[in-house]
């Protein structure tokens, strides 16, 4: 019975230690588990191009419309 209690307490301490080290090192070399797969920092804001500035993809533009033929951001969606 004592051995069971000791094992349960040891597992609880090891689990708590693992969770705190993941959180502690999330700002350094290690990242939080949710961010490990993407490798991105969600707090970083991305810059976008204003209308009439150059673009390569739609997500480069603030309005999310890129004329790929001319590589220019558009103010409104293109007419189809």
UniProtKB/Swiss-Prot annotation:
UniProt keyword Disulfide bond, yes or no: yes
Positions of the pro-segment in this chain: 25-47
Record-linked InterPro entries: Conotoxin (IPR004214)
Signal peptide range in chain numbering: 1-24
Disulfide bonds: 48-62, 55-66, 61-73
GO molecular function, one term: ion channel inhibitor activity
Keywords on record: Disulfide bond, Knottin, Secreted, Signal, Toxin
Keyword Zinc attached: no
Pfam assignment, any one: Conotoxin
One cellular-component annotation, GO: extracellular region
Predominant cellular place of this UniProt entry's protein: secreted
Tissues/organs with expression: Expressed by the venom duct.
Subcellular location field: Secreted
Protein family per UniProt: Belongs to the conotoxin O1 superfamily.
Entry's free-text remark on domains: The presence of a 'disulfide through disulfide knot' structurally defines this protein as a knottin. The cysteine framework is VI/VII (C-C-CC-C-C).
Protein name (database record): Conotoxin Lt6.2
Phylogenetic placement of the source organism: Eukaryota, Metazoa, Spiralia, Lophotrochozoa, Mollusca
């Amino acid at each position: 019975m004592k051995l069971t209690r000791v094992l349960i307490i040891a597992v609880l301490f090891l689990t708590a230690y693992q969770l705190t080290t993941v959180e502690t090192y999330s700002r350094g070399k290690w990242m939080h588990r949710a961010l490990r797969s993407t490798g991105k920092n969600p707090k970083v804001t991305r810059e976008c191009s204003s209308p009439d500035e150059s673009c390569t993809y739609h997500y480069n533009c603030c309005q999310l419309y890129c004329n790929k033929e001319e590589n220019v951001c558009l103010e409104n969606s293109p007419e189809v």
